Amino acid sequence: MVGTRCRQAGQSNGVAYDPILPCERDQLTQRYGQGTLTKVAAVYERPFWREQGLTGFAVDTGFPISIAYDDSPPGSRPGVVFGFVGGDNARRYARLSPGGRRSAVIAQLTQYFGPGARHPKDFFETSWSQEEWTRGCPVGIPAVGSFATYGPRLREPVGRLHWAGTETATFWNGYMDGAVSSGERAAAEAIAEL
C-alpha cells in the first residue's frame, strides 16, 4: 500500500494524474476552490487586556480583522492576540504593503483593547492563499451548482485512489473531526481492497 499527501481532497487540481481522472471526478476537482483567509498574530510583553477585564475576544464587520482571540500561553507572558482576515477583506488586505497590513491590524486591535495594543513586540501573518499545499482556507468550496452535479463523486474511489479530507466528511465537514473521520473511512476502504 502506498499513501501520498496532496492538497485537500477537493483542491487537488494542481496534481497531475496518469491516467487522468474520470470526467465527472475531474470536473468536480476543477470546480472546488478555497476560501481566502489570512491569520495574523500580535505578540505583547503580557496579556494587558486581562488587566482591564477584557477577554481578548472580538468580532467585527470592519476592516481588516473579522474575529480575534486571546492566544496567550498559560501564565502571564507573553500576550498573544491572533485574528482572521477573510473574504473580501483578505483580498483588500493582500493589496496593502507589509507595513500597511501591520498598521491596519494594530489600529483595529487598539480599537478593541486600548492603547496597550499600539506597540506589539512582534507581528506575524500567514496568507493561506499563498501556501502551496492549501492555496486558501478554511475549507474547500464547490462552485455554485457543481456539487449537485458532481458531488456524488466526492468520496467515490478512483481505482486505488481513495479520497480523504474534511471536504469529504459525511459529518462535521470543514472541521478537524470531519477530516479524521474521512481518513478513517478512506483507510477502511483501502484495507477492504487488500
Range-by-range predicted roles:
Residues 14, 31, 36, 51-194:
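Conserved flavin/dinucleotide-binding core of flavoenzymes
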Residues 1-52, 116:
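Central helical "cap/lid" subdomain
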